Amino acid sequence: MPKRRDILAIVLIVLPWTLLITVWHQSTLAPLLAVHKDEGSDPRRETPPGADPREYCMSDRDIVEVVRTEYVYTRPPPWSDTLPTIHVVTPTYSRPVQKAELTRMANTLLHVPNLHWLVVEDAPRRTPLTARLLRDTGLNYTHLHVETPRNYKLRGDARDPRIPRGTMQRNLALRWLRETFPRNSSQPGVVYFADDDNPYSLELFQKVTRRVSVWPVAFVGGLRYEAPRVNGAGKVVGWKTVFDPHRPFAIDMAGFAVNLRLILQRSQAYFKLRGVKGGYQESSLLRELVTLNDLEPKAANCTKILVWHTRTEKPVLVNEGKKGFTDPSVEI
């Protein structure tokens, strides 16, 4: 039987060690416990006075969802009653890179307020690929189609150079606009012919036109860029181009935009299908709408490049073989 003196000695030895171990555990675990407590507690209880509680009750996942909602699902920007509608006319046709190019273009147009995308397919009917893509973009769009007649084509996919690709599709878009809006419509708008293989600066869509606006286009005519020639008074007096500079309007299709009212009032104005030399398609329309003196130079008096006439390299698919190596049902 241990004596009282021995028990007291044991207590006096063990007690200090117990206290030391307890203090050490508390100092080590306290921060970790505090973190777990904060994660499990309701943050709204610690909201500073006067602050919005919603700002203090979001996890990282909540923040990601908010950013995604704000940035993606509110595109395109809200419609404005003070801005004109920009009608972007885009001819397109089936090819391996069609979806890629339309996707790239849609990603630009999603940032433009008051935009209406008029997509016209060179096809006997609207294709599911284009229909799905347009629906999924969230853009305001109209989906049309008209097939270029076979007698306007050469063998294979090569076309008669006198009938440039997209002519009939652009004309159908012009007809749609005239059938949709009355001739004396007060609807403010701009019509721009934008091919699906070009990159466009967002600044381009901020240029409002009274009649016909013009600007340079890069990588056309064998030059770094072609541009209207502007004098010191800010008037277009000619064209900086090598190919047939004496054309009435020596300008690329991507280098001008037309006021909607002008399109509606001049119902005879279309792109000519026959009797038009190569490079004169733009002139065949513009000469029915304006004179050289009516043109409005934009893009810092036509000294700034806002659109590039690029072409996507045709993909080499030799390894697909005649039967196809990959699953043809996978949409590219």
Swiss-Prot record:
Chain ranges passing through the membrane: 7-27
Binding site for Mn(2+): D197
Keyword terms: Glycoprotein, Golgi apparatus, Manganese, Membrane, Metal-binding, Phosphoprotein, Secreted, Signal-anchor, Transferase, Transmembrane, Transmembrane helix
Positions of the record's site feature: Interaction with galactose moiety of substrate glycoprotein: E226, N319
Cofactors required: Mn(2+)
Entry GO terms, CC: endoplasmic reticulum membrane; extracellular region; Golgi membrane
EC number: 2.4.1.135
Location(s), subcellular: Golgi apparatus membrane; Secreted
Record Pfam families: Glyco_transf_43
GO molecular function annotation: galactosylgalactosylxylosylprotein 3-beta-glucuronosyltransferase activity; metal ion binding
Region (Essential for transport from endoplasmic reticulum to Golgi apparatus and interaction with SAR1A) location: 3-5
Binding residues annotated for UDP-alpha-D-glucuronate, in chain numbering: P91, T92, Y93, D122, R165, R170, D195, D196, D197, H309, T310, R311
Topological domain ranges for the Lumenal compartment: 28-332
GO biological process: carbohydrate metabolic process; chondroitin sulfate proteoglycan biosynthetic process; protein glycosylation
Keyword Membrane: yes
Enzyme kind, highest EC tier: transferase
Active site residues according to the UniProt entry: E282
Principal localisation: Golgi
Similarity section: Belongs to the glycosyltransferase 43 family.
Entry protein name: Galactosylgalactosylxylosylprotein 3-beta-glucuronosyltransferase 1
Organism in which the protein naturally occurs: Pan troglodytes (Chimpanzee)
Highest classification ranks of the organism: Eukaryota, Metazoa, Chordata, Craniata, Vertebrata
Chain's gene name: B3GAT1
